[in-house]
């Protein structure tokens, strides 16, 4: 399926000079959303995934239906102050600035094969931080899946050595 026809291009959002790729039209179209999910599920099955991990918030939108289809758990990666129990955290840079990501300390068992999902690969900061959290807890990053990659931001360079699936590139 041509997923680009279901991704809206929004200039100057969230600030001037940024060209935002909006995946909500894809989510609004049941067939497109299912097709995207099915491609990621097929990719995950080849990697014997034990757990899906996704950074907030759009990583949840991609990861939860994938974890449901695989019948494995989903572990959310959240911003500081959003998880109620004991956490580990990492500072990171992203396309629009700096932030902190966290995960529950008991979310991943050592040796679990993890699929990381997110909507977009831009500079790679969010995914690099998510990888750090997964690996600090002893998880094995068995794959990383994105709907969209902004190739001109060269985030893929931060993912060298990891297996990556991207459904559409800009």
Swiss-Prot record:
Q: Does the keyword Transport apply?
A: no
Any one Gene Ontology cellular component term annotated for this protein: cytoplasm
Q: Which UniProt keywords apply?
A: Cytoplasm, Glycosyltransferase, Purine salvage, Transferase
Reaction(s) catalysed (UniProt annotation): AMP + diphosphate = 5-phospho-alpha-D-ribose 1-diphosphate + adenine
Q: Where in the cell is it found?
A: Cytoplasm
Q: In which pathway does it act?
A: Purine metabolism; AMP biosynthesis via salvage pathway; AMP from adenine: step 1/1
What's its top-level EC category?
Answer: transferase
What biological-process terms (Gene Ontology) are attached?
A: adenine salvage; AMP salvage; purine ribonucleoside salvage
Q: Please give the start and end residues of each transmembrane region.
A: none
| Annotated signal peptide | none
Is Membrane one of the keywords UniProt gives this record?
no
List the EC numbers from the record.
2.4.2.7
The Swiss-Prot or TrEMBL record annotates one GO molecular function as:
adenine phosphoribosyltransferase activity
Function, as annotated, reads:
Catalyzes a salvage reaction resulting in the formation of AMP, that is energically less costly than de novo synthesis.
Q: How does it assemble?
A: Homodimer.
Q: Which family does it belong to?
A: Belongs to the purine/pyrimidine phosphoribosyltransferase family.
This protein's name: Adenine phosphoribosyltransferase
Give the species.
Bacillus cytotoxicus (strain DSM 22905 / CIP 110041 / 391-98 / NVH 391-98)
Gene name for this UniProt entry: apt
């Amino acid at each position: 399926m041509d997923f680009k026809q279901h991704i809206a291009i929004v200039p100057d959002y969230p600030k001037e000079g940024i060209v935002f790729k909006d995946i909500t039209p894809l989510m609004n179209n049941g067939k497109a959303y299912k097709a995207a999910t099915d491609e990621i599920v097929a990719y995950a099955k080849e990697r014997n995934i034990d757990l899906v991990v996704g950074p907030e918030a759009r990583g949840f939108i991609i990861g939860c239906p994938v974890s449901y289809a695989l019948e494995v758990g989903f572990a959310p990666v959240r911003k500081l102050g959003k998880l109620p129990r004991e956490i580990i955290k990492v500072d990171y840079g992203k396309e629009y600035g700096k932030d902190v990501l966290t995960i529950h300390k008991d979310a991943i068992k050592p040796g679990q094969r993890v699929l990381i999902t997110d909507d977009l690969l831009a500079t790679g900061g969010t995914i690099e931080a998510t990888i750090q959290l997964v690996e600090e807890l002893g998880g094995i990053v068995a794959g990383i899946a994105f709907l969209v990659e902004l190739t001109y931001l060269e985030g893929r360079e931060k993912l060298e050595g990891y297996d990556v699936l991207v459904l559409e590139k800009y």
